[in-house]
Structure formats: C-alpha cells, structure tokens
C-alpha cells in the first residue's frame, strides 16, 4: 500500500480540506476520472480502485495514479479514556478537492476505459466523472 517512506514528523494536525484542486487536467494518459466531491481517499481505497482498473483492462495499456496518501490519520484504541496524548497512526489518506484527476489510462479503447472507471468508482468514497484529454 502507498505511504511515505519517511516524514519529518510522525503525526499531523487534521486541518481542513478546503481550496481548489491542483492536477485538474488529464496529463499522462488519454482518459481519466475526475473527483466531483470533496473528501479523502485512504491508501486501501486507492489500491483497490487501481487493482479494479488493471483487471478490467486485462493488463493492457497503462494506468497512472494521480493521488498519493501523504496525510497520517491517528486513532486511539477501543475503550481508552480520552486524554493521554494523541493516538497511533493507523492509516494514510489523500485529501481530494473537486476537479482533481484521480486516475488516468492510455492504450485502451474509450469504451473499455469507461467500463474500468465505472467499476473503480464503486470502490471510491466520492463521486467522479469521466474525462478525456483535450488537445489544443
């Protein structure tokens, strides 16, 4: 699963998921899926969607993951009283803003790409839309 090899600090403030997205255009592939909602994706969700896409296109073409889980999320164990410090890092998330391209595909027909992305979207916690590369 995706997670940083090393970070300057182990734990991070929760923060707020506001603002505009970077990476709003299909850059590497021909087709992609773009987030419509604001939210966060865990490393497990990113990997599950990647596997679904790879299997749906039968390992043809190429897949790019445009999001990376770089924010640690901590949790305290069950039945532990409040206080006594911040909990342990349990998983990593990527904060997603509307318009962010999540995955890209190249080397497959459009219909196969649409089908693969439709299957992958069911694994994700936010709504997405299908986008194609615009050539100027």
UniProtKB/Swiss-Prot annotation:
Region entry Disordered, spans: 1-21
Keyword Membrane recorded = no
What CDD domains does this protein map onto?
Ribosomal_L16_L10e
For this protein, the record's InterPro entries field holds: Ribosomal_uL16, Ribosomal_uL16_bact-type, Ribosomal_uL16_CS, Ribosomal_uL16_dom, Ribosomal_uL16_sf
Annotated signal sequence is none
Task: Offer an example of a GO molecular function term for this protein.
Answer: structural constituent of ribosome
Q: PROSITE patterns per the record? A: RIBOSOMAL_L16_1 (PS00586), RIBOSOMAL_L16_2 (PS00701)
Q: How does it assemble?
A: Part of the 50S ribosomal subunit.
What gene makes this protein? rplP
| GO terms classed as biological process | translation
Q: Provide the species name.
A: Buchnera aphidicola subsp. Acyrthosiphon kondoi
Q: What is this protein called?
A: Large ribosomal subunit protein uL16
Name any GO cellular component annotation: cytosolic large ribosomal subunit
List keywords of the entry alphabetically: Ribonucleoprotein, Ribosomal protein, RNA-binding, rRNA-binding, tRNA-binding
């Amino acid at each position: 699963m995706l997670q940083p090899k090393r970070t300057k600090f182990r734990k991070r403030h929760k923060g707020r998921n506001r603002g505009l997205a970077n990476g709003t255009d299909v850059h590497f592939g021909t087709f992609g899926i773009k987030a419509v909602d604001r939210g966060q994706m865990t490393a497990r969700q990113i990997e599950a969607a990647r596997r679904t896409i790879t299997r749906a296109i039968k390992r043809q073409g190429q897949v790019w993951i445009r999001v990376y889980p770089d924010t640690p999320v901590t949790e305290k164990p069950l039945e532990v009283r409040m206080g006594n410090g911040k909990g342990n890092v349990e998983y990593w998330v990527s904060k997603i803003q509307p318009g962010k391209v999540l995955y890209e595909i190249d080397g497959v027909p459009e219909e196969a790409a649409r089908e693969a992305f439709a299957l992958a979207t069911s694994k994700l916690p936010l709504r997405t839309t299908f986008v194609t590369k615009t050539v100027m």
